[in-house]
């Protein structure tokens, strides 16, 4: 196997049809720190831990808006408590908090339908 030239993941991007609404959701509702805001480029970035989350208004950039099926798992200390707080802010979850045997998860979407997950791993990595 060849040595990987991939050094890491620089950012994860989600598409929006309304940049200001997405900024309110990721910044105000989820409490992520906004690090970049370029309204003239229809673009914003948020920071959490070692991840940069980019939010782009794809259609205004000449790209197709698409919602992907892969969840972005957001690490929290207590999934149930974080879910309760977000529900109080109007976020709707799909199903109950579930236990996989190694972690707790709760699924929801952003206002554009991008799938997100509250996640807490309690079992050690093998």
Regions found by a protein language model. Name each.
Residues 20-34:
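Amphipathic alpha-helical segments
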Residues 10, 40-42, 70, 82, ...:
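Residue-level marker for the onset of beta-strands and adjacent loop->beta junctions
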Residues 33-67, 115-121:
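Conserved short beta-strand elements that form part of the metal-binding/catalytic scaffold
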Residues 1-5, 83, 87-126:
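Vicinal oxygen chelate
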Residues 31-37, 93-97:
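Short secondary-structure junctions
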Residues 1-21, 70-74, 122-126:
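N-terminal beta-strand motif that seeds the catalytic metal site of vicinal oxygen chelate
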């Amino acid at each position: 196997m060849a040595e990987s030239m991939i050094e890491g993941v620089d950012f994860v991007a989600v598409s929006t049809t309304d940049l200001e609404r997405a900024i309110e959701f990721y910044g105000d509702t989820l409490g992520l720190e906004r690090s970049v805001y370029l309204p003239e480029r229809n673009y914003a970035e948020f920071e959490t831990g070692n991840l940069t989350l980019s939010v782009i208004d794809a259609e205004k950039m000449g790209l197709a808006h698409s919602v992907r099926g892969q969840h972005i798992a957001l690490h929290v200390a207590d999934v149930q408590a974080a879910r309760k707080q977000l529900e109080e802010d109007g976020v709707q979850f799909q199903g109950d908090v579930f236990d996989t045997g190694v972690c707790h998860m709760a699924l929801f979407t952003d206002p554009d339908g991008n799938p997100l997950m509250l996640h807490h791993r309690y079992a050690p990595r093998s």
